[in-house]
């Protein structure tokens, strides 16, 4: 796997107001897959948006390897997959999965 990011810094557009950073899987930021699952947890610090993004293709072993995840400005993820934008102001604790074949997400309720 190459460590070249999907979007070069000079190609990033301001799609959202600053909201802090997030963590995202390399399957999105390097491999270019769309977001398939996202959740918002309690922030680690003042700059942490709480958002965590996955393509949904990651295995348990993949997720357990911290080297497969990086911290990004939330706007970078919005550039990678703009379909997440309508959901970014959702409350902490929410879990969302993509409705297969669409640009929409639905809340996962336990």
Model regions: which residues?
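Acidic, aromatic-enriched beta-alpha/helix-loop junctions
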Residues: 38-87
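Amphipathic, interaction-prone secondary-structure segments
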Residues: 19-47, 51
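Phenylalanine-focused residue identity feature
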Residues: 5, 21, 53, 69-72, ...
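Short, solvent-exposed secondary-structure boundary motifs
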Residues: 15-18, 25-31, 82-89
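Short, compact, well-ordered microdomains
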Residues: 70-110
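Negatively charged, low-complexity tracts enriched in Asp/Glu with abundant Ser/Thr
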Residues: 2-23
